[in-house]
Amino acid sequence: MFKSKHRMDDVITALTKGIAVYETLRTYNGKPFALKEHYERLKKSLSYLKIEPPAFEDFEKLVYENLSERMRIVYVYSKSLLEYVFQEDTEEFKVEYVKVDITTVRRADPWSIPPDLKSLGRPDIYLARLTKGDNYDVIMLGTKGQVCEGTFSNVFLIKNGKFITPSLESGILDGITRMYVIRFLKESGYEVEERFVEPAELFYADEVFLTHTSRGIVPVNQIGTLKTKSVELSSKLSKAFEEYVKCLL
C-alpha cells in the first residue's frame, strides 16, 4: 500500500533515478519504536544527497497519520520537491528461526558509498538480494573479506557466552535495532564485543542471529548447507528483547 504527498509520476521518476532514501519503522502497542533515532538517520541519508530534511515535527506527524505495525517511509527527490511514499509491510511477522547464506557480492567500499546511506539506489544491496534464493537474507562481506551485514539486517554471533558483532569500522550500517540489542545485552549482564569478524567464525559460533527493525532478534539455524546451529539462547533473547522494547515506550 502506497501513500504519496505528490503526483505518482514524480515519485516514479525519482525512484528510477535512485534519488530516494528510506527508513523502516516498527510499532509496539501502537507506538513507534526509536522514532527519533530513525529520523536522525533519515536526516543523515538526506544530507549525503544534499537535500534539506523535513522537520522532526512534520516527520512525527506523518508517521502517526499513517501508523501501522510495520511500515516503510520513502523520501524521494524530484523537480526540487521532497516527497514521501508509505509502504505497509505485509510479510508474515512470526518466524522462529531462519536460513541464511554468505553471498559472493561484496559490500561497496565505504569510501565510495557510505554504509549509513539508506538509499534505494544501492547496487551492492540490490545485486546481493538477487542471490538470496530461498534464504531469509544473505550476509555480505567487506572489501577485506570481513563479515559486514545482511542486505537488511545486522549480524551477531554467540561464542562461549560472549556476543560478537561486526564493528562500525567493518563498514556496516549503524543499525538502530543493533544499537538497542547491544544495550539490552549489556544491561542483561552479557559481554558484547564489536570487532572485525572473519567469515569462518560464523560456522564455528555456538549461535548466530540477525537483528533488524521489523522483527527484532531473528535466530539463525542454518548457514548455507550447515544446518547444525542452536537457537536456544537467541530464541529466548528474541522474546525478552520484545518485552524490553515495550517497556521503553
PLM regions and their residue ranges:
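Ordered, amphipathic secondary-structure segments that act as subunit-interaction surfaces
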Residues: 69-77, 87
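Helix-start/capping segments and mature chain N-termini
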Residues: 1-65, 82-249
